[in-house]
């Protein structure tokens, strides 16, 4: 952050733990993944997340084309996502974003852990739970602590 400020880039903000962007310059495509929203991937090797299922297409273009020509879906493998997995991913991915997550997403059993990280200056809590600039440096550990306490 100091490097950005020293170069006159104070309007750049860390939109996600590992990415920086100017306001309005966020990659909307990647935000779909980080917000755990659904997407449909088209083409050989493409991945999709629809409903409570992830799947990916065959990788070889020839096989992909033959399957489509035969009227078959070119899906190579599927993975059903349980409610628990969906919750874990929503918390894990959402806390990595600047906007954070609704505080209600965190189970009551984790409130002591949240309070400890708030007191340490690593989290901000209101109706949303967000990592502070200091907390972003320790994001994986904080998220692991919260999820383990739920």
Each predicted region: which residue ranges?
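Single conserved hydrophobic/aromatic residue that forms the stacking wall/gate
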Residues: 2-13
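Short, amphipathic alpha-helical interaction segments positioned at domain boundaries
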Residues: 136-150
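Short, Lys/Arg-rich nucleic-acid/phosphate-binding segment
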Residues: 20, 128-129
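Hydrophobic, secondary-structure "cap" segments at the distal end of domains
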Residues: 31-34, 38-118, 128
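Short, electropositive alpha-helical surface patch
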Residues: 20-36
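Conserved S-adenosyl-L-methionine
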Residues: 15-19
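Short, glycine-/Ser/Thr-/acidic-enriched flexible segments
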Residues: 22, 47, 136
């Amino acid at each position: 952050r100091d490097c950005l400020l020293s170069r006159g880039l104070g309007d750049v903000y860390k939109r996600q733990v590992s990415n920086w962007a100017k306001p309005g310059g966020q990659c909307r495509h990647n935000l779909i993944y980080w917000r755990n929203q659904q997407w449909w991937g088209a083409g050989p090797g493409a991945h999709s997340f629809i409903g409570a299922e992830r799947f990916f297409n065959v990788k070889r273009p020839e096989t992909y084309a033959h399957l489509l020509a035969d009227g078959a879906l070119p899906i190579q493998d599927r993975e059903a996502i349980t409610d628990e997995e969906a919750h874990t991913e929503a918390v894990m991915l959402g806390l990595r974003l600047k906007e954070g997550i609704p505080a209600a997403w965190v189970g009551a059993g984790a409130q002591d852990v949240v309070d400890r990280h708030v007191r340490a200056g690593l989290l901000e809590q209101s109706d949303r739970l967000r990592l502070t600039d200091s907390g972003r440096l320790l994001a994986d550990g904080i998220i692991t602590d919260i999820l383990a306490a739920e």
